[in-house]
Amino acid sequence: MTANAIVELELDDIQGGALRERPSPYVGTYVLLRIDDQQAGRQMLRRLLPVIDAGPTSSDPAKDAWVSVALTYQGLKALGVPPDSLASFAPEFVQGMAARAELLGDVGENGPDSWEKPLGTPEVHVGLAALSPSAEKLATVLERARRAYTELPGVTVIWRQDCYQLPTGRNPFGFKDGIGQPAVEGSGVPRSNSKEPPLKAGEFILGYPDETGSLPPMPKPEVLGRNGTYLVFQKFHTRVAAYRQYLRANASSLEEEALLGAKMVGRWQSGAPLTLCPDRDDPELGADPSRNNDFLYYEDDLRGFNCPAGSHARRMNPRDALKDDTSVDVRLHRMIRRGTTYGPMLPEGVLEDDGADRGIAFVFVGAHLKRQFEFVKSQWVNDGIFIGASQENDPLVGPNDGTGTFTIPHRPIRRRLHGLPSFVVTRGGEYFFVPGLRALRWLAELET
């Protein structure tokens, strides 16, 4: 198979949650399980198989309600996966997120010692995720999943997080999210950016060529690795009041507050990109999925006068802005991102923290943990060398400590914000493997 050959994904073997878009509106639940008995764990997988849908079966995500199952390295061990198979997984996955925390910048209040237990501990074996466009459909699909692990003494629920779309349809900071997902070749999901070709399937699903033209390393045997992928789960607490206070202190009007927030994020609250509408929000553009992601940076905004190079959106996906830098290929560092909110919304205009826990449960999907998630987090989110600002990190989700800065290009004189505090705190996370359906059957039928 040549590097330019278009592959056909075996969608009937790929868990739907790997490629399917998040419904909108949505409600969801994440459940973590511990396997105390090997046979009970395998029995649970056999029961779960009929509940799990394959592939992005609907072009309308509002119609979908689905469940996905994922396993940690410790979970695979608990199921009795042979040592040679365990050794074939990515080293980052084997170590687990807690062991990689320092590399990821999760230290101090963001470090594993401060995480919400059992996140980041060896007790986390299985992760279930359910997303639905309605509470009724979620309850139905959750009940089907619940029957798979109840009445099994050797399987224990150890954690649960419920999520739902806020009444505004936006994230806790007030911004529309879920925009700018990469197009995956062969997935059947239409691309939202006509200026970028779809990414090779092997960037996201194991068993297919990636952007280098090679097959990514895959767990063995082939039945276990093929059509699987890696998944990163993280829970973030958001300091919404601190974010609003910072904007208020650095702006002279509500209009300037909105502009500063947009400069930090890279989009207006409606989702409209600064690159296309730099001066004022355009809700109609923000609501149009055929236009709100259809842009590049190199020709239109290379210097960041519209959308700062250090903004959150541009750090997560620099698009073509780095094409003159031969040391980096942005297409090797893309991820499928899926965020869901938890906790109550802080009422509009409130500047004081009410003490409620609110935030985002984030999922990142990709075939390469190290050069996708870990690279983006350590090199683009937590560092600014690649944009010529080595002392700056992501103004919204970076590990700022009250001394952070953020540069806003402007003619004739740039503006630099000072004293950035932390607006996001890591509450925990884990690395998972999302097996294909045949792999789940293989795991369920393992012999001791």
Per-region residue spans from a language model:
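Long, low-complexity, Ser/Thr/Gly/Pro-rich intrinsically disordered segments that act as flexible linkers
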Residues: 1-448
